[in-house]
Amino acid sequence: MANSSARPAFLVMTALALLLLLCVGPGGISGNKLKLLLRKREAPAPTMTPVAVQESRAKEFLSSLRRPKRQLWDRSRPEVQQWYQHFLYLGFDEAKFEDDISYWLNRNRNGHDYYDYYQRHYDEDSAIGPRSAHSFRHGASVNYDDY
């Protein structure tokens, strides 16, 4: 009985001694490895690099730079007003243009709703219909492509 309880204690003591030997003992040429791991690295303090221009002069120079905004379609310019009036005279409608842009930009975002990523624009109620009977819905009174 005494022999069986002494074996785990002996194993624990051996493991502790081995751990202490590994951690505290000298690590060959480099010395104590645990101390080397735990010690903070000593680095020299960063030195200020010499600068040709003082900070205040540099900030003054950078703050003086102002980049003018380049707006081609600035409505306050008289030639732009003239161009815009001419576009309106030609039939250009800005609201319709914005609608068209949003339509064409969003067209491919939900393309899988229509058969195989294609949006086909023929009339469902036409007499002949599409060439393939399985490619489109027949007989509805609405052309679903328009919605």
Curated annotation (Swiss-Prot):
Residue ranges of the propeptide: 32-68, 132-147
Cellular localisation: Secreted; Cytoplasm; Apical cell membrane
KW ATP-binding (keyword) present: no
Predominant location category: secreted
Keywords assigned by UniProt, alphabetized: Cell membrane, Cleavage on pair of basic residues, Cytoplasm, Membrane, Secreted, Signal
GO cellular component: apical plasma membrane; cytoplasm; extracellular space
Top-level taxon: Eukaryota
Keyword Amino-acid biosynthesis part of the UniProt annotation: no
Family: Belongs to the augurin family.
Protein name: Augurin
Organism: Bos taurus (Bovine)
